[in-house]
C-alpha cells in the first residue's frame, strides 16, 4: 500500500519557467506558487515500513513473497488481505475533457489526476493511482482498464467526454467485479441532489412539486436528470445550446431515465431556454458562464433556486445571484454553497472498498445525497448554508457508512462479505 506525501518541498532558490498567462488570470506571484506546488509532481510511493535488514528483505521479497503469491493463486480473494488492492483506486482519464479546458490530451491531464490522488489519500485514506491513457478510442480504453484492473479495488473515471463516457462506464462495470464510477457524472449528481434537498427546505417546497430546468446535457447534466428523476422529481426540462431538448410526461421520463442519452432531441429543440424557464422553480446549470440574465430570472416562479455550476465563470454571476435568487450556489470555493463532487467520491469509494461492493448503484447515490443533506443541521440551514463544506470531517465517514450499508442492503458485495 502506498502513502502519498502531503508536504511540498520547494528549493530555496526556486527558478520557475515563465508561462504566458491569458489576460485576467493569475498574477505572476500566484502562478509561481502554483508551479512551485507542482514541481516534481504532487504524489509519491513509499513503503509502509523500511527494508533495513536481510531478514526484512527476505520477508517482503524473495523468498518470502513466493508463499503469498501461491496463496493468492489458490484463492484470489486473498489479494484483498495481503496486498494493497483493497485500498487502491485507479484514477483513469483519456484527457478528452480536462476540467473546463477541453481536450488537452493525457499528459496535460496528469496534474489534475495527481490532485485527485492527493484528495483520495488525505480525505479518505485511499491510495489512488493516476492512469492517463494515450487513446480516446472507447474499445481500447475498456480493454486497457480491464487489463490493469487486477491491481485495483475500484476504478474512478475522470475527465472523459460525453457521450463516450456513458458507454465506457457501463461496459467497464459490466466487465469488472469492482465498483466503477465516472465522477463527472455521478459525483456531481449526488451533490446537486443533496444541495437541492436543503434548498427546497429553505423555500418550503417539495421535490415532486417543483419544475426543474437542467441547462447543459453533457455527462454531468444527464446524470443530474437521471438522479433527480429517481429521487422523485416530477417536472423536468433539459436544455442545451440548441434550446429545450428534453421534456415529456413525468412517468415516461422516470421509466426511461437510464436511456436519457438516447431520447434527448439534440437536433430537434421544442423551445428555447427562456421557454423552459417559464414558471420554473429551480435552475441547475452545468453548462457555460454568463448564460442567465436578470430578465431570464423574472420568467421563473418566486423564490428561485439557481445552481450555477460552470467554472470558472458561473451561468449567473454571484452579484446577480445573491440579488435575484432565494438560494444561489456555485461550484466555486470563494462563495457560500459550493457544490463540489469532492463531497461525494472520497467517501463513496471508502465505503465501497470497506464493504467489498461490486458496483455503485442508484440506491447508494440516493442514500448518499440524503446523508449529505442531513449533515447540515436544522439550526444552521439557511439560504447561504445548504451543503457541508468540503473539509467538514464528518462528511467522508458518514458517506462511507451510508454506502457500506446500501451495498449490503442491495446485495452488491463480494461473496463471503455479506
Model region roles, listed by residue range:
Residues 2-180, 405-406, 410, 414:
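N-terminal ligand-binding/catalytic initiation module
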Residues 23, 183-184, 205, 308-417:
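Adenosine-phosphate binding glycine-rich loop
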Residues 79-85, 121-122, 147-149, 173-174, ...:
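Solvent-exposed alpha-helices and their adjacent loops that cap or buttress functional pockets
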Residues 94-96, 104, 133-134, 159-162, ...:
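Short, ordered loop/turn segments at secondary-structure junctions
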Residues 99, 104-124, 182, 186-284, ...:
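Glycine-rich phosphate/diphosphate-binding loop of Rossmann-like nucleotide-binding domains
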Residues 130, 156-159, 180-183, 214, ...:
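General beta-strand structural signal in soluble alpha/beta enzymes
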Residues 257-327, 332-334:
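Rossmann-like adenosine-cofactor binding region
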